[in-house]
Swiss-Prot record:
Function in brief: Required for accurate and efficient protein synthesis under certain stress conditions. May act as a fidelity factor of the translation reaction, by catalyzing a one-codon backward translocation of tRNAs on improperly translocated ribosomes. Back-translocation proceeds from a post-translocation (POST) complex to a pre-translocation (PRE) complex, thus giving elongation factor G a second chance to translocate the tRNAs correctly. Binds to ribosomes in a GTP-dependent manner.
Gene behind the chain: lepA
Protein name: Elongation factor 4
A single BP term in Gene Ontology: positive regulation of translation
E.C. code: 3.6.5.n1
GO cellular component: plasma membrane
InterPro entries named in the record: EF-4, EFG_III/V, EFG_V-like, EFTu-like_2, G_TR_CS, LepA_C_sf, LepA_CTD, LepA_IV
Classification via SUPFAM superfamilies: EF-G C-terminal domain-like, P-loop containing nucleoside triphosphate hydrolases
Organism annotation: Salmonella paratyphi A (strain AKU_12601)
Length: 599
């Protein structure tokens, strides 16, 4: 056991985590050169296309160190994006140490800090690594000072390497073996294994990634899931070298995969503890804290026949992604679907794309909203995650919106622009600290503004230099109203949005104008209105298409023309009473862009 090292790689987006993982795999001979490819751990097509890591992946490698010993390295490559920080915290729970990778050109960024603090809270040994020293812009001295100033860990002798060229990667491994402690645990005690992650395989059922904390797990053992008290047979187990390799046992301190023919997707939830059925452990390991979704949106299949397969797909996906929340929802405009909760807009986009690709579905998404806390006049507190669930205005005593605490790190040159943006987003400054030429800003901004397009706008006002980390702080009373959209005097529930009263006029007008462009013209006039309660705040009309009924008249008497026009008018009137308007998919997506800059 003293030769096992479990560690994660944490860093800001694009600081080179996945490339460093590639080099480590190559040096330790996990894959032959023929099988090696760039970003070997980003196994999803989506991850490769966007160049980001979404799912944490684990690998077991053997490394022969300079002291002649062979060490077993279990390492987990983690995502860097703010929306996937729960993946990082889950990976860290399985480790004793973390490699903090910092780009020697960019320096410390917000996510570097957030992930590093998560690791320190879990009492992990953090080893700083300066990556990308082959770049002409690299300044390792300055960045080492920055790490000490901002993060507060000693970086004077931080390892310098270039994952791209492979320089210094062996030093990283030597340092890691030296500084990261071996796992603690009792190899002879009762089995306790923590489920770090699980996914669904069509042939094997549920595959779980486990970290053995105490005891040993052998092939063929009877295994009990502590939360559900169900017992299963350990059919196959093994490690990833990135390929799946079968083993006969997993020893204390190791990380590996397990298949025990669980067909029910809720059979082995992430964060649960596995123990042996013969000699069970007394208590479960502390799991992970449940992450609360920040953004909710309705997802509906385009054709209602897909509802069943959509439900199965969501079930399989939620197994792999513990933070995805969903419940059935029906809408008069869109039929049956699900209300889903996500951690942020990127997470929402990724989930929608994975559903469409991996499960071949066509989906419509409604506008994302955050959760509001509503105190009714009957003094009840309810949580509303969809505009259609908001009680009528006269039943609301107080409406509170979620406030996010945003930590931003940016160069001084862009401070003015970023402050202007934060004020425009109804933000309140709580802290500002200068570190050299970097500024650390803390603002409290309403969550609804953050999830809409704050990240994109922050990047564009600071030319991509600012970085952001945010978390939920509290609920705060606010003057929010629901803007409804009426089409021919009928409310369309899927188009409603909740917004601040100050912005409601402009948002309503903008939405109505957008709808006017998107709804195709019909044989009758279509009135599109935005309303708060019964008060109409904006209106526009999609003009009817009409045939020229006078074309056949060639001159002739005016009363003859009047008769024809009158007849057409009555026909249109009758049509309007029975006609209904088909809304195109773009109309629902239009709300996503309301309130965004049309630059």
């Amino acid at each position: 056991m003293k030769n096992i090292r479990n560690f994660s790689i944490i860093a800001h987006i694009d600081h080179g985590k996945s490339t460093l993982s590639d080099r480590i795999i190559q040096i330790c001979g996990g894959l032959s050169d023929r099988e090696m490819e760039a970003q070997v751990l980003d196994s999803m097509d989506l991850e490769r296309e966007r160049g980001i890591t979404i799912k944490a992946q684990s690998v077991t490698l053997d490394f022969k160190a300079s002291d002649g010993e062979t060490y077993q390295l279990n390492f987990i490559d983690t995502p860097g994006h703010v929306d996937f920080s729960y993946e990082v915290s889950r990976s860290l729970a399985a480790c004793e140490g973390a490699l903090l990778v910092v780009d020697a050109g960019q320096g410390v960024e917000a996510q570097t800090l957030a992930n590093c603090y998560t690791a320190m809270e879990m009492d992990l040994e953090v080893v700083p690594v300066l990556n990308k020293i082959d770049l002409p812009a690299a300044d390792p001295e300055r960045v080492a000072e920055e790490i000490e100033d901002i993060v507060g860990i000693d970086a004077t002798d931080a390892v310098r390497c270039s994952a791209k060229t492979g320089v210094g990667v062996t030093d990283v491994l030597e340092r890691l073996v030296r500084d990261i402690p071996p796992p603690q645990g009792d190899p002879d005690g009762p089995l306790q294994a923590l489920i770090i992650d699980s996914w669904f395989d069509n042939y094997l059922g549920v595959v779980s990634l486990v970290r053995i904390k105490n005891g040993t797990m052998r092939k063929g053992d009877k295994i009990k899931v502590m939360s559900t008290r169900q017992t299963y047979n350990a059919d196959r187990l093994g490690i990833f070298t990135p390929k799946q390799v079968d083993r006969t046992e997993l020893k204390c301190g190791e990380v590996g995969w397990l298949v025990c023919a669980i067909k029910d997707i809720l059979g082995a939830p992430v964060g649960d503890t596995l123990t042996s059925a013969r000699n069970p452990a007394e208590k479960a390991l502390p799991g992970f804290k449940k992450v609360k979704p920040q953004v909710y949106a309705g997802l509906f299949p385009v054709s209602s026949d897909d509802y069943e397969s959509f439900r199965d797909a969501l079930g399989k996906l939620s197994l792999n992604d513990a933070s995805l929340f969903y419940e059935p929802e029906s809408s008069s405009a869109l039929g049956f679907g699900f209300r889903c909760g996500f951690l942020g807009l990127l997470h929402m986009e990724i989930i929608q794309e994975r559903l469409e690709r991996e499960y071949d579905l066509d989906l419509i998404t409604t506008a994302p909203t955050v959760v509001y806390e509503v105190e009714t006049t009957a003094k009840e507190t309810i949580y509303v995650d969809s505009p259609s669930k908001l009680p009528p205005l006269n039943n609301i005593y107080e409406l509170r919106e979620p406030i996010a605490e945003c930590h931003m790190l940016l160069p001084q040159a862009y401070l003015g622009n970023v402050i202007t943006l934060c004020i425009e987003k109804r933000g309140v400054q709580t802290n500002m600290v200068y570190h050299g030429n970097q500024v650390a800003l803390t603002y409290e901004i309403p969550m609804a503004e953050v999830v809409l397009d704050f990240f994109d706008r922050l990047k564009s006002t600071s030319r991509g230099y600012a970085s952001l980390d945010y978390n939920f702080k509290r609920f705060q009373a606010s003057d929010m109203v629901r803007v409804d959209v009426l089409i021919n005097n009928e409310r369309v529930d899927a188009l409603a949005l909740i917004t601040h009263r100050d912005n409601s006029q402009s948002r309503g007008r903008e939405l109505v104008e957008k709808m006017k462009d998107l709804i195709p013209r019909q044989q009758f006039d279509i009135a599109i209105q935005a309303a708060i309660g019964t008060h109409i705040i904006a209106r526009s009309t999609v003009k009817q298409l009409r045939k020229n009924v006078l074309a056949k008249c060639y001159g002739g008497d005016i009363s003859r023309k009047k008769k024809l026009l009158q007849k057409q008018k009555e026909g249109k009137k009758r049509m309007k009473q029975i006609g209904n308007v088909e809304l195109p998919q773009e109309a629902f997506l239009a709300i996503l862009h309301v309130g965004k800059d049309n630059k």
